[in-house]
Amino acid sequence: MHVGTITKLFHDKEHGLIRDKNGEEAHFHKHCLWNIQFKELLEKQAVEFEIQPSTKGFLAFHIRPLAAQGQ
């Protein structure tokens, strides 16, 4: 599982960008979310996700908000 931050949300097409802690950027679509709706996401929000290569770079999937410490 990777950890990163949502850097950009495109609300009109329901997709966005995530940057991991190593600086790699991955795109994602609303279908890649796990137990959260696209409208609940915020830019600069910390998230956990899986990543795989795609024709457009990297694709993030199984995206979910990073659990707060102690939970």
How should these model regions be labeled?
Residues 22-24, 45:
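Short acidic/polar mixed-charge low-complexity motifs
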Residues 13-17:
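Short aromatic-glycine-enriched beta-strand elements
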